[in-house]
Amino acid sequence: MAKKVQAYVKLQVAAGMANPSPPVGPALGQQGVNIMEFCKAFNARTESLEKGLPIPVVITVYADRSFTFVTKTPPAAVLLKKAVGIKSGSGKPNKDKVGTVTQEQLRQIAETKAADMTGATIETKMKSIAGTARSMGLIVEE
Protein backbone atom coordinates (compact mmCIF):
# COMPACT_ATOMS: atom_id res chain seq x y z
CA MET A 1 0.00 0.00 0.00
CA ALA A 2 1.18 3.52 -0.76
CA LYS A 3 2.49 5.70 2.05
CA LYS A 4 0.14 8.36 3.42
CA VAL A 5 1.23 11.86 2.42
CA GLN A 6 1.39 14.23 5.39
CA ALA A 7 2.48 17.44 3.61
CA TYR A 8 4.08 19.04 0.59
CA VAL A 9 6.78 21.62 1.33
CA LYS A 10 7.88 23.97 -1.46
CA LEU A 11 11.18 25.81 -1.03
CA GLN A 12 13.85 27.56 -3.06
CA VAL A 13 17.28 26.42 -1.90
CA ALA A 14 20.68 27.46 -3.27
CA ALA A 15 22.26 24.59 -5.22
CA GLY A 16 24.82 22.69 -3.14
CA MET A 17 24.28 24.98 -0.15
CA ALA A 18 21.34 23.44 1.76
CA ASN A 19 21.86 23.70 5.52
CA PRO A 20 19.62 23.52 8.61
CA SER A 21 19.32 27.31 8.92
CA PRO A 22 16.18 29.09 7.66
CA PRO A 23 14.34 28.55 5.37
CA VAL A 24 15.12 24.80 5.27
CA GLY A 25 15.32 24.00 9.00
CA PRO A 26 12.04 25.51 10.23
CA ALA A 27 10.01 24.31 7.22
CA LEU A 28 11.15 20.69 7.57
CA GLY A 29 11.38 20.71 11.37
CA GLN A 30 7.65 21.48 11.61
CA GLN A 31 6.96 18.29 9.66
CA GLY A 32 9.32 16.16 11.75
CA VAL A 33 11.71 15.42 8.89
CA ASN A 34 15.39 14.66 9.50
CA ILE A 35 16.81 17.99 8.28
CA MET A 36 20.42 16.87 7.86
CA GLU A 37 19.34 13.85 5.81
CA PHE A 38 17.50 16.19 3.40
CA CYS A 39 20.43 18.63 3.26
CA LYS A 40 22.92 15.87 2.38
CA ALA A 41 20.62 14.36 -0.27
CA PHE A 42 19.81 17.77 -1.82
CA ASN A 43 23.46 18.86 -1.91
CA ALA A 44 24.46 15.55 -3.51
CA ARG A 45 21.77 15.89 -6.18
CA THR A 46 22.65 19.52 -7.00
CA GLU A 47 26.46 19.28 -6.86
CA SER A 48 26.69 19.30 -10.68
CA LEU A 49 24.82 22.63 -10.87
CA GLU A 50 26.36 26.06 -10.39
CA LYS A 51 26.82 26.62 -6.65
CA GLY A 52 24.43 29.20 -5.22
CA LEU A 53 21.87 29.06 -8.05
CA PRO A 54 18.38 29.01 -6.44
CA ILE A 55 16.68 25.67 -7.14
CA PRO A 56 12.96 25.20 -6.45
CA VAL A 57 12.31 21.92 -4.65
CA VAL A 58 9.05 20.17 -3.72
CA ILE A 59 9.42 17.90 -0.71
CA THR A 60 6.75 15.25 -0.10
CA VAL A 61 6.59 14.36 3.60
CA TYR A 62 4.93 11.05 4.50
CA ALA A 63 3.12 10.10 7.72
CA ASP A 64 6.09 7.95 8.85
CA ARG A 65 8.29 11.10 8.57
CA SER A 66 10.15 9.80 5.55
CA PHE A 67 10.34 12.10 2.52
CA THR A 68 11.02 12.33 -1.19
CA PHE A 69 11.85 15.45 -3.14
CA VAL A 70 11.78 16.71 -6.71
CA THR A 71 14.11 19.46 -7.90
CA LYS A 72 12.96 21.85 -10.61
CA THR A 73 14.91 24.13 -12.95
CA PRO A 74 15.99 27.58 -11.69
CA PRO A 75 13.43 30.40 -12.11
CA ALA A 76 13.40 32.12 -15.52
CA ALA A 77 14.16 35.50 -13.92
CA VAL A 78 17.36 34.14 -12.35
CA LEU A 79 18.49 32.63 -15.66
CA LEU A 80 17.72 35.90 -17.49
CA LYS A 81 19.69 37.97 -14.97
CA LYS A 82 22.63 35.58 -15.33
CA ALA A 83 22.45 35.65 -19.17
CA VAL A 84 22.37 39.46 -19.32
CA GLY A 85 24.81 39.93 -16.43
CA ILE A 86 22.73 42.13 -14.13
CA LYS A 87 22.13 42.00 -10.37
CA SER A 88 18.39 42.78 -10.43
CA GLY A 89 15.60 43.74 -12.79
CA SER A 90 14.28 47.26 -13.26
CA GLY A 91 12.15 48.92 -10.59
CA LYS A 92 10.18 50.62 -13.39
CA PRO A 93 10.27 48.14 -16.28
CA ASN A 94 8.06 50.29 -18.53
CA LYS A 95 10.43 53.28 -18.23
CA ASP A 96 13.92 52.11 -17.21
CA LYS A 97 15.51 49.38 -19.32
CA VAL A 98 18.42 47.54 -17.68
CA GLY A 99 19.69 45.31 -20.49
CA THR A 100 19.04 43.46 -23.73
CA VAL A 101 18.36 39.78 -24.27
CA THR A 102 18.84 38.06 -27.65
CA GLN A 103 16.69 35.38 -29.29
CA GLU A 104 19.56 32.90 -28.87
CA GLN A 105 19.67 33.57 -25.10
CA LEU A 106 15.88 33.12 -24.92
CA ARG A 107 16.20 29.80 -26.79
CA GLN A 108 18.91 28.55 -24.38
CA ILE A 109 16.81 29.48 -21.33
CA ALA A 110 13.67 27.91 -22.87
CA GLU A 111 15.60 24.67 -23.53
CA THR A 112 16.92 24.69 -19.95
CA LYS A 113 13.43 25.19 -18.51
CA ALA A 114 11.59 22.98 -21.04
CA ALA A 115 10.85 20.19 -18.55
CA ASP A 116 9.09 22.54 -16.09
CA MET A 117 7.16 24.67 -18.60
CA THR A 118 3.88 24.23 -20.43
CA GLY A 119 3.75 25.00 -24.12
CA ALA A 120 3.80 22.80 -27.18
CA THR A 121 6.93 24.10 -28.89
CA ILE A 122 10.20 25.74 -27.94
CA GLU A 123 8.94 28.94 -29.64
CA THR A 124 5.95 29.22 -27.29
CA LYS A 125 8.26 28.71 -24.33
CA MET A 126 10.56 31.42 -25.71
CA LYS A 127 7.57 33.81 -25.88
CA SER A 128 6.76 33.07 -22.25
CA ILE A 129 10.34 33.80 -21.19
CA ALA A 130 10.37 36.95 -23.36
CA GLY A 131 7.35 38.15 -21.36
CA THR A 132 9.26 37.56 -18.13
CA ALA A 133 12.21 39.49 -19.59
CA ARG A 134 10.00 42.46 -20.53
CA SER A 135 8.47 42.55 -17.04
CA MET A 136 12.01 42.75 -15.62
CA GLY A 137 12.86 45.78 -17.77
CA LEU A 138 14.89 43.95 -20.42
CA ILE A 139 14.72 44.76 -24.12
CA VAL A 140 13.95 41.66 -26.21
CA GLU A 141 15.71 41.66 -29.59
CA GLU A 142 13.56 40.42 -32.47
UniProtKB/Swiss-Prot annotation:
Listed GO MF terms: large ribosomal subunit rRNA binding; structural constituent of ribosome
One Gene Ontology cellular component term attached to this UniProt record is: cytosolic large ribosomal subunit
- Keywords, comma-separated and alphabetical: Methylation, Ribonucleoprotein, Ribosomal protein, RNA-binding, rRNA-binding
- Please outline how this chain is modified post-translation: One or more lysine residues are methylated.
Q: Known PROSITE patterns for this protein?
A: RIBOSOMAL_L11 (PS00359)
Sorted alphabetically, which CDD domains does this protein's record hold? Ribosomal_L11
Could you tell me the superkingdom of the organism this chain comes from? Bacteria
What are the annotated disulfide bridges? none
- InterPro entries the record matches: Ribosomal_uL11 (IPR000911), Ribosomal_uL11_bac-typ (IPR006519), Ribosomal_uL11_C (IPR020783), Ribosomal_uL11_C_sf (IPR036769), Ribosomal_uL11_N (IPR020784), Ribosomal_uL11_N_sf (IPR036796)
List, in alphabetical order, the GO biological process terms annotated in this UniProt record.
Answer: translation
Q: What does this protein do?
A: Forms part of the ribosomal stalk which helps the ribosome interact with GTP-bound translation factors.
Family note = Belongs to the universal ribosomal protein uL11 family.
Subunit composition and interactions: Part of the ribosomal stalk of the 50S ribosomal subunit. Interacts with L10 and the large rRNA to form the base of the stalk. L10 forms an elongated spine to which L12 dimers bind in a sequential fashion forming a multimeric L10(L12)X complex.
Q: What is this protein called?
A: Large ribosomal subunit protein uL11
- Which gene carries the instructions for this protein? rplK
